[in-house]
């Protein structure tokens, strides 16, 4: 497979590796971006395991809670400007209200909102506002107590990041603190048990390869892996993360002190995982001039 400059740039952007190292990683792994990242980490050439997904889409995430049921909905637009539009915000709020009774994203799009489906309401809004829009995704959660939080709010209940936290016991103030923590730190799962076993095994293998590069005895390597995986879990699982409100405690320990059990969470961020293709404007103009 031919390794292009764009592929090298993407790998450099996601790992902080040098140009020649990035090119070699792609060559060694036949252009497989994910395998190239692991190769760089194994060789100690990646500055950090940065997330390769680039956020590009605009819009708003809205959260709604009714009793022990909460929903979060992402509605995308082409520009950030539309997210500040009162008509767009009103539509997003209406969609979130409807989402409280929807089972999934398809049911939400087909649900009634003011005499028309949500999907048709969005199509009509496109004609009025003049930008392409879409109801991209929704997530829901149930629990004894459900608390919501919006980061970078554009209007009540909607902003760039929406979080829902479900707890048994504890008070609303603690739930709000946990929701703010989740917005800031973005844990991958509630606990180790909730992580994809394949992801855990892959991380363990990467750490094993890194440790073996040191040339240390196998018994020492095994102890190194235990320590490194413990550190990994403290970084990606909510209950094991250092609590932003009190860094001396893990979130799990803070929950015990608050008399609460955290049973789940939802975190949606606008544009998460969507990549937009950036056109080279100068090249486009040059091409047009040449005919």
From Swiss-Prot:
Q: SUPFAM superfamilies under this entry?
A: Elongation factor Ts (EF-Ts), dimerisation domain, UBA-like
Concerning InterPro entries, the annotation shows: EF-Ts_dimer_sf, Transl_elong_EFTs/EF1B, Transl_elong_EFTs/EF1B_dimer, Transl_elong_Ts_CS, UBA-like_sf
One GO cellular component term of this record is: cytoplasm
Q: Where is this region: Involved in Mg(2+) ion dislocation from EF-Tu?
A: 79-82
Record-linked Pfam families: EF_TS
Where this protein primarily resides, as one coarse class? cytoplasm
Note the Gene3D superfamilies from the entry. 1.10.286.20, DNA helicase RuvA subunit, C-terminal domain, Elongation factor Ts, dimerisation domain
Keywords for this entry? Cytoplasm, Elongation factor, Protein biosynthesis
The record's subcellular locations are: Cytoplasm
Instruction: Return one GO MF term.
Output: translation elongation factor activity
Q: Tell me the protein family, please.
A: Belongs to the EF-Ts family.
General function of this protein? Associates with the EF-Tu.GDP complex and induces the exchange of GDP to GTP. It remains bound to the aminoacyl-tRNA.EF-Tu.GTP complex up to the GTP hydrolysis stage on the ribosome.
Question: What name does UniProt use for this protein?
Answer: Elongation factor Ts
- Record organism: Roseobacter denitrificans (strain ATCC 33942 / OCh 114)
Taxonomic lineage:
Bacteria, Pseudomonadati, Pseudomonadota, Alphaproteobacteria, Rhodobacterales
């Amino acid at each position: 497979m031919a390794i292009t400059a764009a592929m090298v740039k993407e790998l450099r952007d996601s790992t902080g590796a040098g140009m020649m190292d990035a090119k070699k990683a792609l060559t060694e792994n036949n252009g497989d971006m994910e395998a190239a990242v692991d190769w760089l980490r194994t060789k100690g050439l990646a500055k950090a395991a940065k997330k390769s997904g680039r956020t590009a889409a605009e819009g708003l995430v809205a959260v709604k809670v009714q009793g022990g049921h909460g929903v979060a909905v992402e509605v995308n637009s082409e520009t950030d400007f539309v997210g500040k539009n009162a008509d767009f915000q009103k539509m997003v709020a209406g969609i979130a209200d409807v989402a409280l009774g929807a089972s999934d994203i398809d049911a939400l799009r087909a649900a009634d909102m003011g005499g028309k489906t949500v999907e048709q309401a969005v199509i009509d809004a496109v004609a009025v506002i003049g930008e392409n829009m879409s109801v991209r995704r929704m997530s829901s959660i149930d629990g004894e107590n459900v608390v919501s939080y919006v980061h970078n709010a554009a209007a009540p209940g909607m902003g760039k990041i929406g979080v829902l936290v479900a707890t048994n016991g504890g008070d609303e103030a603690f739930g709000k603190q946990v929701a703010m923590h989740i917005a800031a730190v973005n844990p991958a799962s509630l606990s180790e048990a909730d992580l994809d076993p394949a992801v855990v095994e892959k991380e363990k293998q990467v750490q094993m390869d890194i440790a073996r590069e040191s040339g240390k005895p196998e018994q020492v390597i095994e102890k190194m892996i235990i320590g490194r995986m413990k550190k990994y879990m403290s970084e990606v699982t909510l209950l094991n993360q250092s609590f932003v409100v009190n860094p001396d405690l893990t979130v799990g320990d803070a929950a015990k002190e608050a008399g609460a059990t955290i049973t789940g969470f939802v975190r949606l961020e606008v544009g998460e995982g969507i990549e937009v293709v950036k056109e080279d404007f100068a090249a486009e103009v040059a091409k047009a001039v040449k005919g």
